[in-house]
Amino acid sequence: MDSITTAASVVAAGLAVGLGAIGPGIGQGSAAQGAVEGIARQPEAEGKIRGTLLLSFAFMESLTIYGLVVALVLLFANPFAG
Amino acid sequence: MGSLSFALPFAELEVGQHLYWQFGNFSIHGQVFMTSWLVIGALLALVVVGTKKMERDPRGVQNLLEFLWDYIRDLARTQIGEKVYRDWMPFIGTLFLFIFVSNWGGALVPWRLIHLPSGELGAPTADINTTVALALLVSLSYFYAGLSNKGLRYFEYYVHPTPIMLPFKIVEDFTKPLSLSFRLFGNILADELVVAVLVFLVPLVLPVPVMFLGLFTSAIQALIFATLAAYYIGEAVEEHH
């Protein structure tokens, strides 16, 4: 692979994970905020809230993971490697 | 680039290297097959041992199996609905247990002690082929569930609130297996990579909490895969009024 492709792939891999982490980060923050408010208002519902929160966390996290998959493809299985 | 490997005794990190088995015209990833067979064998042994001498008051393995049965039944019943959940419980349960034991097996068993000529043993779910196969099975089964329960009326689902939804629902049929497989694959591979990189940088103490976090996310991912599979099946068999 020529050096310009390598450089572009490495930069793109970094951007894919980095930018992909912004949205889910904000989303997880506001989800956690909602859960904490819910628990403060109704402590007896903690178990249910925790379960739902973890499940929705995993969904948000998978968005970053898609970015990670793209980064891994660029680093280890680059289709432009030639 | 192709593949990457560092050489420290317990901190090898290999991505994209596989133990290839030639099978006719296909070359298959042997290490994935070996670990999946081990997982299947472990699950079978557990179930056989647990159901051999069943008692009215469950003890030991039988107790564990009954707990799992309850857990999977609740999962299937809340997602699929009272009417047909019983038909799909074995499928959902198999998915959940296979993925769960694969994920934990990949993290807990010291596979690095066994040397392979190429590639390394690990969680079968850290290979994209396994997760795509599982996700396609889910796709097939929700089509089957919808068609066998409602016949051709299943396709009403595509135009359900309004016909405008038709293209989105068709695209959804393709994105469902895509996101199911990538979510599981990415999460498990990311867990393994993070632990491997940390072990490579700081071989002592520091990786342990990350390993626990990895165990936790692996368990959640198994739960999510099973829940989503059940939810898709439930969506397909649901009656619209």
Curated annotation (Swiss-Prot), chain A:
Membrane topology: Multi-pass membrane protein
Source taxon at top rank: Bacteria
InterPro entries: ATP_synth_csu_bac/chlpt, ATP_synth_F0_csu, ATP_synth_F0_csu_DDCD_BS, ATP_synth_F0_csu_sf, ATPase_proteolipid_c-like_dom, F/V-ATP_Csub_sf
PROSITE patterns: ATPASE_C (PS00605)
Keyword Nucleotide-binding: no
Main location: membrane
GO MF assignments: lipid binding; proton-transporting ATP synthase activity, rotational mechanism
Site keyed Reversibly protonated during proton transport: positions: 61
The keyword Ion transport belongs to this UniProt entry's keyword annotation: yes
NCBIfam families cross-referenced by the UniProt entry: ATP_synt_c, PRK07354.1
Family label: Belongs to the ATPase C chain family.
SUBUNIT field: F-type ATPases have 2 components, F(1) - the catalytic core - and F(0) - the membrane proton channel. F(1) has five subunits: alpha(3), beta(3), gamma(1), delta(1), epsilon(1). F(0) has four main subunits: a(1), b(1), b'(1) and c(10-14). The alpha and beta chains form an alternating ring which encloses part of the gamma chain. F(1) is attached to F(0) by a central stalk formed by the gamma and epsilon chains, while a peripheral stalk is formed by the delta, b and b' chains.
The protein, known as: ATP synthase subunit c
Organism encoding this protein: Prochlorococcus marinus (strain MIT 9211)
